[in-house]
């Protein structure tokens, strides 16, 4: 039961008590830059080895990415504030891009220039207690699809996604998130028994996402991606049985602790092959 409940999808009952092993408080420094994507991917293994946390956001229809490197620093080091972020910035970029919709080539050129200009600036740096550096406000409403592919497949998967966006001329400017996580032994974890590269595609909540996500999801499938349980995807029990070595073990535990399915909603029934709907 413990192995199943560590990622139980809310299907195994109500957890009333949790004991967590912690580490001593620590401080972090986070450096954010805009850099050419090709150089990042060529040096990806060194970046993973050199940084405590390494991630980037690739800008569709451009050759650039926003790179975030986070590392531990001495807690006594001076605090550095990165200043206030402008939560409307991405909307301003979208408005500028869409205002040139009648001239799509001009719009893409202007978008590339906006991103290129950001690359000319100095790195943004902030430091302090870990909980102040790692936490970010999310004020832009969006829909998201996230898959985790084997770590070694990450670069090729991302390249194919970006190429598909260009080939199909998908009008998206929302950055694509890319990050790594080490493997674990949790039955239904996206990182179960393999190091993972998580890649997320987003679309503004007030824009249609269906066609975009439908074009990208088969690429994740090609690279044996596992979808984030709390985000949009179209997979069902057959796919999960192939993606998770302990899928049947989990189903057996679920049947034993909740034989009448009292903890299941329509979405969970679909995931477990018990009918229901594919939408939460």
What are these model-derived regions, one by one?
Residues 1-280:
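Noncatalytic alpha-helical scaffold of FAD-dependent oxidoreductases
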């Amino acid at each position: 039961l413990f192995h199943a409940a560590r990622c139980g999808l809310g299907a195994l009952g109500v957890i009333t008590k949790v004991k967590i092993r912690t580490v001593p408080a620590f401080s972090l420094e986070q450096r954010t830059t805009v850099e050419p994507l090709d150089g990042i991917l060529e040096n990806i293994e060194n970046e993973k080895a050199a940084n405590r946390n390494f991630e980037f956001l690739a800008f569709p229809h451009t050759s650039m990415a926003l790179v975030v490197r986070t590392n531990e620093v001495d807690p006594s080091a001076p605090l550095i504030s990165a200043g206030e972020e402008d939560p409307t910035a991405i909307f301003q970029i979208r408005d500028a891009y869409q205002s040139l919709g009648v001239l799509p080539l001009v719009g893409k050129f202007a978008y590339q220039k906006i991103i290129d200009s950001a690359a000319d600036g100095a790195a943004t740096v902030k430091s302090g207690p870990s909980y102040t550096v790692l936490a970010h406000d999310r004020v832009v409403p969006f829909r998201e699809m996230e898959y985790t592919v084997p770590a070694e497949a990450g670069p090729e998967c991302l390249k194919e996604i970006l190429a598909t966006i260009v080939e199909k001329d998908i009008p998206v400017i929302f950055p694509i998130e890319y990050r790594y996580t080490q493997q674990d032994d949790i039955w239904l974890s996206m990182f179960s028994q393999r190091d993972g590269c998580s890649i997320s595609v987003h679309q503004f909540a007030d824009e249609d996402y269906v066609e975009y996500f439908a074009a990208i999801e088969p690429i994740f499938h090609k690279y044996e991606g596992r979808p984030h349980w709390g985000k949009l995807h179209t997979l069902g029990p057959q796919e999960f049985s192939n993606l998770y070595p302990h899928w049947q073990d989990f189903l057996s535990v679920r049947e034993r602790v909740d034989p009448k399915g009292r903890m299941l909603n329509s979405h969970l029934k679909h995931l477990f092959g018990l009918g229901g709907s594919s939408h939460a």
